[in-house]
Amino acid sequence: MKLAIPNKGRLQQPVLQFLNYVGIRPLSSDERALIIPTNWEGIQLVMLRTEDIPSLVEAGAADIGITGYDYVLESGANVDELIRLDFGKAKIVLAVPLSWDYNSPDQIKQEIRIATKYYNLAKKYITEKGIPAKVVKISGAAEVIPSLGAADAIIDVMSTGTTLKLHGLKPLDTVLETQAVVIGNRYWMKSDEADKINLMLTMMKGALYARNKKMIFMNVPDSKLNNVIQSLPAMLSPTLSKLAKGDAWEVITVIDGDKLPEIIAKVVANGARDIVVVDIEKVIK
């Protein structure tokens, strides 16, 4: 089974880190290698340009791919979006010179030139917004193009806005919000690799779900048990085990990590003790 991932760019390291968290690790660090075996038998990583992944997955060069949602839409590839990964988030924005006294794209009345690598997204955007513009397709860094006089504005990725400001630009409107996504060609469920792909997708979903989860173990006196249980949000319900000695119970539950301080304070106030908090690697549902 071939899994296409970015060979460089802003998504490469986050994708590799996520795969490592899932349990998929490349067995070679050779940056020149285009197809790399992994520790999962039968799964190979195919290193491709991020923007090429949707079209090549559609063509069957890989069964599954991880790329940006922006590139899926830009390519128009006939692929299935399988999982949104909740990382690699960014905005595709229309950016104009800081000197322009515009607060909205509706204020653009005269034709402008927009430089972008997102030609199809840009054409769709200006049509929907009614912006008089000519789209100039480029493949490199867009931020410098207005200062060179080759365009008036750009449509490009913005993470923080620092790079835009450095080049005398400001975001005027959001064209699209993007993130990393897992995609598959339309035939993956009927392929010989379907079972392997389904297992990998299950593990990915389990890793995503567990990313901000904590498991809590605590001992609770019998007389305090109901009060402690009432203070616990659980995925289903807390797991209870009677301790071998004494009138006490072991209580086990799973909570969101950002609620940990609040929950700890409540259970301690209600009589819990000997509390142990453990990170969760995966939750398979």
Swiss-Prot record:
Reaction equations catalysed: 1-(5-phospho-beta-D-ribosyl)-ATP + diphosphate = 5-phospho-alpha-D-ribose 1-diphosphate + ATP
The keyword rRNA-binding belongs to this UniProt entry's keyword annotation: no
Enzyme Commission code: 2.4.2.17
Name of the gene this protein is made from: hisG
Superkingdom of the organism of origin: Archaea
Keywords for this protein: Amino-acid biosynthesis, ATP-binding, Cytoplasm, Glycosyltransferase, Histidine biosynthesis, Magnesium, Metal-binding, Nucleotide-binding, Transferase
Pathway: Amino-acid biosynthesis; L-histidine biosynthesis; L-histidine from 5-phospho-alpha-D-ribose 1-diphosphate: step 1/9
Record has Lipoprotein as a keyword: no
Lineage: Archaea, Thermoproteota, Thermoprotei, Sulfolobales, Sulfolobaceae
Cofactor: Mg(2+)
Protein family according to the UniProt entry: Belongs to the ATP phosphoribosyltransferase family. Long subfamily.
Gene Ontology CC: one annotated term: cytoplasm
Top EC category: transferase
Protein name: ATP phosphoribosyltransferase
